[in-house]
């Protein structure tokens, strides 16, 4: 099932469940721009009956981004069923892949008295690490906070975040001249990230990217992509701005280490047809272990971390049987050597 919670074909979510209980969810941007990194709080169960099968889903309204409304609210839905052994796909309303319209063609539905309450979410953590080779131990703690004062505004913040539990990336064999963009898997950056994506208004088949089965994937035939101004994987990534003195040797392993964050703040919301987003993040001081070339004595090379800032404004209108949109995005990446403003 797919739900256009805006009611105007501006944004939505999809929820899939298989007969064996497997689940998948994600977000939808106009028209058929689908991302699967989002992980929503919902429940689904299936069962085989004497006459066939059944499926039930419980999707809380608070999991969806919804514009501020009155007692009666307009949304749109679409339902899909895939019969694997026949390789057939059914949908209501009919939404063939050859059709440019997708989310704006969902079936309108009116609902009453749906106005999710404001929400608080707090995730503290404590972790410890031990390095037996260097005979070192380290402990740390931090907190993630999310606040949704209304259905059309969400504020999230993280202090000393712990991204060590994030699953690793798949191995991608890229023999092209184009950079591989790995998907974002950190929850803080996933929530509301669709606002920061500059996407085409009509995308019948979906974007290109790594394909194939198993852990080793190959890059498919290159197709023109939207302008990418924000790649959040570079926030907290390996430091590229550190200058290494000639008398010092730093291993490639040290240089490829991710940089820890001091904290980050993000605000995402909407007012009518205007959607907006603000993201800022601050990295900790970079510390690399190096070796003096002449003495083989170890030393620590230090450098200030980077600061990041992003502002996004997007106005969309689906009135008059057409779609109009105009947007702005500004980015800042600041480090001790230079500042990049786009």
Which residues make up each language-model segment?
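Long, ordered, helix-rich scaffold segments
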Residues: 322-326
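Structural preference for beta-rich elements and adjacent junctions enriched in aromatics
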Residues: 1-317, 327, 337-339
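Cysteine-dependent hydrolase recognition
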Residues: 330
